[in-house]
């Protein structure tokens, strides 16, 4: 067993906690959209085919924008990338809540805006930033904690959202989402990226962009 302290600095601990909260909020909300379908179908006349297309588009954009946010993380830091992602996520939810929620607006808000937001807030960026704060001996544990936090969000959020849908309706539930995403904007500022990753020499500090060029 390594004799190194698991939390090597206060900044590492804060980043670990903040990144965990980020993925709980992001993945927790994303996991629950399927619960809204019957309300969307009844109140907004969203068909199952349109709903399925938008969810697929959301996943596609999540994947497309993840490496782009990786470049932003390399250049400006994880806090900036995650903050931008939460802005897209929050604007998508607020526009939908405000009435831009049928036809093409449904595709734009839930599919495009939230899909882009997931590119930096879901799991890849928070995990990669946390990994840079820990040496190889503790890195797996640290990133595992963030991944576990995402799983916790997956598990808990459907239970809470289902209760909220029954008791308060889908509009109020989306309003609660916007409050959580607003919290995410604040928490994102604490996901700091070290100038030199722990355990990496300055001469060997390779960015994602450098790795792509080398490949």
Positions of predicted regions on the chain:
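C-terminal ends and interior cores of transmembrane alpha-helices
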Residues: 87-101
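Intracellular juxtamembrane helix-capping segments at the cytosolic ends
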Residues: 120-134
């Amino acid at each position: 067993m390594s004799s190194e302290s698991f939390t090597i600095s206060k900044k590492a601990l804060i980043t670990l906690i903040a990144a965990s909260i980020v993925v709980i909020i992001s993945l927790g909300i994303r996991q629950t959209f399927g619960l809204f379908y019957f309300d969307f179908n009844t109140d907004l006349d969203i068909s199952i085919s349109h709903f399925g297309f938008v969810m697929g588009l959301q996943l596609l954009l999540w994947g497309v924008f993840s490496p782009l946010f990786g470049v932003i993380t390399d250049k400006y830091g994880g806090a900036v990338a995650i903050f931008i992602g939460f802005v897209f996520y929050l604007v998508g939810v607020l526009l939908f809540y405000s009435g831009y929620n049928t036809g093409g607006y449904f595709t734009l808000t839930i599919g495009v805006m939230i899909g882009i937001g997931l590119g930096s807030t879901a799991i890849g960026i928070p995990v990669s930033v946390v990994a840079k704060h820990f040496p190889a001996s503790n890195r797996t544990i640290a990133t595992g904690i963030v991944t576990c936090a995402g799983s916790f969000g997956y598990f808990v959020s459907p239970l809470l959202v289902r209760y909220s849908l029954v008791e308060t309706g889908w509009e109020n539930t989306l309003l609660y989402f916007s409050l959580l995403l607003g919290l995410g904007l604040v928490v994102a500022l604490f996901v700091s990226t070290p100038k030199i990753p722990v355990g990496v020499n300055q001469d060997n500090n390779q960015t994602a962009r450098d790795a792509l060029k080398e490949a």
